[in-house]
From Swiss-Prot:
Residues 3-127 form the ApaG domain. The gene is apaG. Coiled coil: none annotated. The lineage of its organism: Bacteria, Pseudomonadati, Pseudomonadota, Alphaproteobacteria, Hyphomicrobiales. It comes from Sinorhizobium medicae (strain WSM419). It holds the Pfam family DUF525. InterPro entries: ApaG-like, ApaG_domain, ApaG_sf, Uncharacterised_ApaG. This is Protein ApaG.
């Protein structure tokens, strides 16, 4: 698992390979990831937008942004957690993702919360160090 803490908001990511949706013979590799967002602050916050920076093993970058996550803009009161799952397809057997959420505190202040970088590695992937 991967974790980041920004402004007392903790983001935990657990990626997993989706073998049943992947087809290596057709250069299709799919991962799921589970995210848990925990509000350790003393104010309510709402997740407004998301931004993802996705890089495959060839260095090809894809940037994804939009409102909320999975169609929601969840409100997290102090002590609350919010969990969701989503996925990411790549044309290569490995890659890396990171990003941020834009949050709005109950007083109207907006700030970004880091999504930690996490690796997407196919099972059985052999790495060579030169």
């Amino acid at each position: 698992m991967y974790r980041a803490l920004t402004h007392d908001i903790e983001v935990t990511v657990e990626p997993y390979y989706l073998e049943e949706q992947s087809d290596p013979d057709d250069s299709r590799y799919v991962w799921g990831y589970r995210i848990i967002i925990a509000n350790h602050s003393d104010v309510a916050v709402r997740l407004m937008t998301r931004y993802w920076h996705i890089t495959d093993e060839n260095g090809q970058v894809d940037e994804v942004s939009g409102p909320g996550v999975i169609g929601e803009q969840p409100l997290l009161n102090p002590g609350d957690t919010y969990e969701y799952s989503s996925g990411c397809p790549l044309d290569t057997p490995s890659g890396v993702m990171f990003g941020h959420y834009s949050m709005e505190a109950e007083g109207g202040e907006t700030f970004n919360v880091a999504i930690p970088a996490f690796s997407l590695d196919s099972p059985g992937l052999v790495r060579t160090l030169n």
